[in-house]
Amino acid sequence: MNLNSIEIQKIIPHRYPFLLVDKIIDMEVGKRAVGIKNVTINEPFFQGHFPDQPIMPGVLIVEAMAQVAAVICMGSEENEGKLGVFTGIDNCKFRKQVVPGDALHIEIEMTAFRRGIGKAEGKAYVDGQLACSASLTFALIDKA
């Protein structure tokens, strides 16, 4: 299953400037997905991180991974309309800087999901090189 940015926005609540996944190029709902974030110099965070040497903040790489995980979970009917929130980030490692012009290739695999709590393993690559890896834990909650 492939999704463009319009279709992604029908599943998760994130919007510009905080929508950090541009498309899903492969997905098994509830199991795994591969997403792409095209990183451009026009990203608002590059104004201050860092003006003379723009680098995507690591926490936003992790957030991009979380958004792909949210698409996996909230793409199923039983989780439609829920809100995904972090409950934990473990074993997070940053291996490569992500800069304007990079295409962040995000691979997420769900490892557990019970009673609204999910766990996923995430990896983000640039040009085939590992940029970030992390274990993500989150809860799906009802919107207020």
UniProtKB/Swiss-Prot annotation:
Organism: Alkaliphilus oremlandii (strain OhILAs)
EC primary class: lyase
Gene this protein is translated from: fabZ
Protein name: 3-hydroxyacyl-[acyl-carrier-protein] dehydratase FabZ
Keywords, comma-separated and alphabetical: Cytoplasm, Lipid A biosynthesis, Lipid biosynthesis, Lipid metabolism, Lyase
InterPro entries, A to Z: FabA_FabZ, FabZ, HotDog_dom_sf
GO CC terms, sorted: cytoplasm; membrane
Domain of life (superkingdom): Bacteria
Catalyzed reaction equations: a (3R)-hydroxyacyl-[ACP] = a (2E)-enoyl-[ACP] + H2O
Protein location: Cytoplasm
